Amino acid sequence: MSHEPEYRDWQQIVELIRSSVDSQQHEMLLTMLMTPDERESLTARVNILNELLKGELSQRQISQMLGVGIATITRGSNELKSKSEAEKDKLKLLLEQVAQVAK
């Protein structure tokens, strides 16, 4: 008897998260899926993308501000470069909206 994992691709994970948001269980799900270090890394990645999209600081300044390596900033920058302007605009708007709610 061979067993296969039920979750095999990224879209299934995205759907799991979407479903957890719909049922107000997203915080519980993400807390259970990610270690404290992973959550900290994800927070850093969000801040990296946010700062890169703002375009006000150099990669070195972002690295110093967030306490992450320059290679981490470069990976975020490379990921952004692979996206269309429309995708970047959507992400920037989403980040701005959430930042306004948090203030």
UniProtKB/Swiss-Prot annotation:
Its keywords, alphabetically, are: Cytoplasm, DNA-binding, Repressor, Transcription, Transcription regulation
Name the SUPFAM superfamilies for this protein.
Answer: TrpR-like (SSF48295)
Where primarily located?
A: cytoplasm
Molecular function per GO: DNA-binding transcription factor activity; sequence-specific DNA binding
What Pfam families does UniProt report for this protein, alphabetically? Trp_repressor (PF01371)
Question: Tell me, which GO biological process terms does this entry list?
Answer: negative regulation of DNA-templated transcription
Q: Name one GO cellular component term.
A: cytoplasm
Q: Looking at the UniProt feature table, which residue ranges are given for the DNA-binding region?
A: 59-82
Role description: This protein is an aporepressor. When complexed with L-tryptophan it binds the operator region of the trp operon and prevents the initiation of transcription.
Summarize subunit and interaction data from the UniProt record for this chain. Homodimer.
Instruction: Name the protein family.
Output: Belongs to the TrpR family.
**What is the protein's given name?**
Trp operon repressor homolog
Give the organism's phylogenetic lineage.
Answer: Bacteria, Pseudomonadati, Pseudomonadota, Gammaproteobacteria, Vibrionales
